[in-house]
């Protein structure tokens, strides 16, 4: 229970701070006991609230009894505060962009679809906010960022949740080389703000976010770990190579998807310390500027940590003609059956580019995955206050013979009976009657109401 106390603060002879109570006030009643863990004299913990499913479903209990869980979410807030301060100190503007969008752009992902009744049109939950932020660069802002809730109707695992938090930032008159240096400074700053040091422990690994980070091209990475050079290869050659490596691929995959599958299966997991993978093939990056030295590549990097991507950045494509061709390539992939390809051309975004967008670099960071590394949590569910879960199944209730008798009598009388008459008809001893009705009430199967001068028991539907 919650009790308010009024009194005088004093210090005991042994130095303990105490209150000499003058008045108690009852504030709130608790109907359920907390599952408080107990530590025995040998240091063993008993009755710990550590069942993962129960913890995620009842986070309010988890936060109350497990201090380490509360500490994780305090650090999560520190991360957002530190990152926001870093951007604000650089003079960049925090903005808000739509969650409901008419075209699901800015990423290759399957969207959630909903319907706007008033406008009678389909809308999509945001998969990314990239195209709206670029519109703001066109509008004259030189640096904008947003912490956004994004939604992708895809699989769930220890590092993916259908609803997640991303940060995206766009800065005019910069390129991806500048953004790599900016990212190094940002992540070192955030690690120190959250943990007091740039070094963190994640599982068996010691990760150091201190700048600078290693840089490896996508082509060199794949060649190093597989011996296969992706340069200049056709879609058929990439398909055959992936099959030969034992990678599961299908006919709907284009060149970009095939290269992505090869890198993900054979290379990605080898990068433990922060490493920039740079210069992606053009087919993998429909919104990225062509590489200044090689027209087959793009000026893009992904930052890998412990075998997973935590940041993705480009020198942004600002040529509306080139951008239209990339969108058309995406449409061809969508028609071929790639459900992650965007099958809709965003004409308004192309129109914005036609008004002119300065050279710009943009970066997105997966905030949930980043805080996993900074708090040594291997599961994304541990860093989300209320992770997505299947609906809770109703527990099967085993009834005693006496409880079954009462239920049967109620059902035979249209689910309700006079309480006194029911008790006589059931012919149970006082002890068995009390136990049976208490059990049925506890499981919310019956309720008793007053009808005039008599009491009525009825089944709860």
What residue spans do the PLM features occupy?
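Short amphipathic alpha-helical interface segments
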Residues: 398-426, 435
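Class II aminoacyl-tRNA synthetase catalytic cores and aaRS-like
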Residues: 1-396
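Short amphipathic alpha-helical interaction segments
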Residues: 428-442
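Short, cationic-aromatic polyanion-contact patches
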Residues: 396-403, 450-461
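A short, conserved structural fragment
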Residues: 441-451
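Short Asp/Glu-rich motifs
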Residues: 106-107, 442, 459-460
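Surface-exposed charge patches
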Residues: 85, 240, 408, 438-439
């Amino acid at each position: 229970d919650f009790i308010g106390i009024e009194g005088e603060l004093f210090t005991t002879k042994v130095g303990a701070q105490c209150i000499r109570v003058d008045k108690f006030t009852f504030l709130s009643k608790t109907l359920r006991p907390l599952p408080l863990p107990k530590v025995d004299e040998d240091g063993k913990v008993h009755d710990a609230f550590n069942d993962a499913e129960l913890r995620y479903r009842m986070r309010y209990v988890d936060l109350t009894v497990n201090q380490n869980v509360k500490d994780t979410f305090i650090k999560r807030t520190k991360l957002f505060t530190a990152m926001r301060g870093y951007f604000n100190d650089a003079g960049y503007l925090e903005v808000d962009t739509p969650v409901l969008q008419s075209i699901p752009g800015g990423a290759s992902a399957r969207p959630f679809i909903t319907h706007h009744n008033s406008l009678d049109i389909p809308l999509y939950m945001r998969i990314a906010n990239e195209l709206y932020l670029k519109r703001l660069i066109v509008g004259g802002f030189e640096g904008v960022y947003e912490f956004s809730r994004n939604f992708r109707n895809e699989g769930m695992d220890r590092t993916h949740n259908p609803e997640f938090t991303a940060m995206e930032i766009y800065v005019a008159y910069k390129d991806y080389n500048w953004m790599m240096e900016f990212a190094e400074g940002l992540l070192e700053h955030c690690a120190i703000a959250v943990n007091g040091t740039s070094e963190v422990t994640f599982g068996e690994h010691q990760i150091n976010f201190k700048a600078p980070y290693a840089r490896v091209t996508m082509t060199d990475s794949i060649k190093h770990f597989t011996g296969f050079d992706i340069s200049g290869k056709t879609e058929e050659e990439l398909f055959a190579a992936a099959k030969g490596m034992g990678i599961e691929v299908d006919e709907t995959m284009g060149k970009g998807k095939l290269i992505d599958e090869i890198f993900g299966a054979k290379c990605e997991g080898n990068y433990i310390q922060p490493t920039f993978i740079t210069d992606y093939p053009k087919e993998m990056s429909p919104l990225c500027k062509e590489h200044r030295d090689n027209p087959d590549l793009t000026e893009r990097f992904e930052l890998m940590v412990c075998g997973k991507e935590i940041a993705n950045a480009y020198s942004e494509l600002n040529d509306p003609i080139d951008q239209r061709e990339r969108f058309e390539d995406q449409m061809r992939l969508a028609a071929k059956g790639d459900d992650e390809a965007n099958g809709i051309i965003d004409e308004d975004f192309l129109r914005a580019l036609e008004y002119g967008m300065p050279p710009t670099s943009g970066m997105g960071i997966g905030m949930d995955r980043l805080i996993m590394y900074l708090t040594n949590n291997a599961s994304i569910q541990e860093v989300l206050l209320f992770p997505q879960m299947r609906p809770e199944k109703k527990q099967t209730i085993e009834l005693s013979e006496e409880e079954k008798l009462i239920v049967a009598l109620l059902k035979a009388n249209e689910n309700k009976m006079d309480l006194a008459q029911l008790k006589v008809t059931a012919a149970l001893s006082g002890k068995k009657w009390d136990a049976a009705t208490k059990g049925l009430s506890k499981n919310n199967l019956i309720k008793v109401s007053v009808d005039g001068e008599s009491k009525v028991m009825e089944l709860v539907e």
